Amino acid sequence: MTVLIHVLGSDIPHHNHTVLRFFNDTLAATSEHAREFMVAGEDNGFTESCPALSLRFYGSKKALAQAVIAKAKANRRQRFFFHGQFNTSLWLALLSGGIKPAQFYWHIWGADLYEVSNGLKFRLFYPLRRIAQGRVGCVFATRGDLSYFARQHPNVRGELLYFPTRMDPSLNAMAKECQRAGKLTILVGNSGDRSNQHIAALRAVYQQFGDTVNVVVPMGYPANNQAYIDEVRQAGLALFSAENLQILSEKMEFDAYLALLRQCDLGYFIFARQQGIGTLCLLIQADIPCVLNRDNPFWQDMAEQHLPVLFTTDDLNEQVVREAQRQLASVDKSGITFFSPNYLQPWHNALRIAAGEAE
């Protein structure tokens, strides 16, 4: 029997760390198909912190792709589980036959599915990637992303799967201890990545609420982002008074980030695609409603779980926000499909499907 190989095809430290830690702590002990990884980027202590996994690191995305293609050609029974897919060479290999459809299983992370960049090289590459995506053996994704993908590729198998957000189920009831009143605090974006469209989001918040709310913008990740942080701060101070705007430029530890989220009354996410599920989950767990772009298909997942959804096009005010908080507080968090531990069983199913052990 050939053991499934997992591929992290791009050097995205935060996401890769979450995936590796999840597999090491939760999946590796019960499945031999949850232990082999090929990772783009440096070790950064992963080998030491994930002793249950067999990890191979590659200095570049291209080097990793070449190694994957060589393995795929050497043994056509070898299957790969691609987590996210930000690696041009791997898509081209699927397109050209270097990797066969029966070898290629893909967990969509959102950004790797949507065509949002206006850069020339991306606009030229997107049509090729779209064709390649139609050759995937099976995709795993959120309900909204599965729906989006199926419109383009109705013949490709799709299975529900959620990114393994680090969550403590015991905190599901913690929000009940918080009494929310006074000036609203609004979280804008889930990181410092430009995909959050921070400046447009700040303007949208100002248009809805004026300079009457506290605005918190977490921008400690990714690193080396000071120029963009300064740009966002300047735009924010043109709208909000200094005491109402908090730009967080330092990377935060998980517990500190969790404490920050629980001080908020509303999350505001203007991006028109699925991203930031981890932050959304932690906000929902704390009974903090989220404002989404109507083009972000994750609203379908939220509606399926009977969670209130606010949209950027809605008329928002404190009364609307407090009512959404009340509705969230009435939801039994233990039944939400994309919360821990409920997302675990779909992961076990995904491993069996990708390994060829389940229909």
Curated annotation (Swiss-Prot):
Annotated Pfam families: Glyco_transf_56
Topology in membrane: Peripheral membrane protein
Top enzyme category: transferase
EC number annotated for this UniProt entry: 2.4.1.325
Keyword Nucleus applies: no
One GO location term (cellular component): plasma membrane
Location of this chain's protein in the cell: Cell inner membrane
GO MF annotations, alphabetized: 4-acetamido-4,6-dideoxy-D-galactose transferase activity; fucosyltransferase activity
NCBIfam families recorded: PRK02797.1-2, PRK02797.1-3
Protein family (similarity comment): Belongs to the glycosyltransferase 56 family.
Function summary: Catalyzes the synthesis of Und-PP-GlcNAc-ManNAcA-Fuc4NAc (Lipid III), the third lipid-linked intermediate involved in ECA synthesis.
Protein name listed in UniProt: TDP-N-acetylfucosamine:lipid II N-acetylfucosaminyltransferase
